[in-house]
């Protein structure tokens, strides 16, 4: 997979590495964020807690660093799954990414969104989130719709099992 500037990768549709972080709280709710409208693509859309592009071989370090930069969250992350997608996201942007999805759990509601990256955040019940996505799919990023669909089909029980120690 190529190592080039992310803007070039998106303009030319060149395949590259990315990561997406899912965060759940001790009530089992997922943190979602609405990206700042000024973002160069997918601005103003709802998505998972944070995303980024993998530059080094240390995926967990990069994801934890990005999570702190965007939301002020520090937590342990675990690999959940990986997928590839190739989608046009605007008239000039193409997402051709191998996306590693990571998951983390927090006991706190203390979130400190970076206003340059994030317009707002909210905690959502996963079932309600799926309903909102079905009703208004254009309000959500392409990759987040793929992720939530995959989680619903294959990983929901695993996530609930992971939440059990946090709820105790």
What are these regions (language model features)?
Residues 7, 43-44, 81-84, 89, ...:
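Nudix hydrolase/Nudix homology domain
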């Amino acid at each position: 997979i190529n190592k080039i500037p992310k803007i070039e990768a998106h303009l030319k549709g060149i395949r590259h590495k990315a990561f997406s972080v899912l965060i759940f709280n001790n009530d089992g709710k997922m943190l979602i964020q609405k990206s700042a409208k000024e973002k160069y693509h997918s601005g103003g859309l709802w998505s998972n807690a944070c995303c980024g592009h993998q530059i080094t071989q240390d995926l967990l370090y990069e994801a934890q660093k990005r999570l702190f930069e965007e939301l002020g969250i520090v937590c342990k992350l675990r690999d959940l799954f990986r997928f590839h997608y190739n989608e046009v996201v605007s008239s000039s942007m193409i997402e051709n990414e191998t996306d590693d999805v990571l998951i983390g759990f927090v006991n706190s509601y203390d979130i400190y969104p970076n206003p340059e990256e994030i317009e707002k955040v909210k905690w959502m019940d996963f079932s309600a989130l799926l309903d909102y996505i079905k009703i208004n799919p254009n309000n959500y990023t392409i990759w987040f719709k793929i992720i939530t669909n995959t989680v619903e089909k294959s990983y929901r029980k695993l996530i609930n099992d992971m939440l059990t120690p946090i709820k105790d």
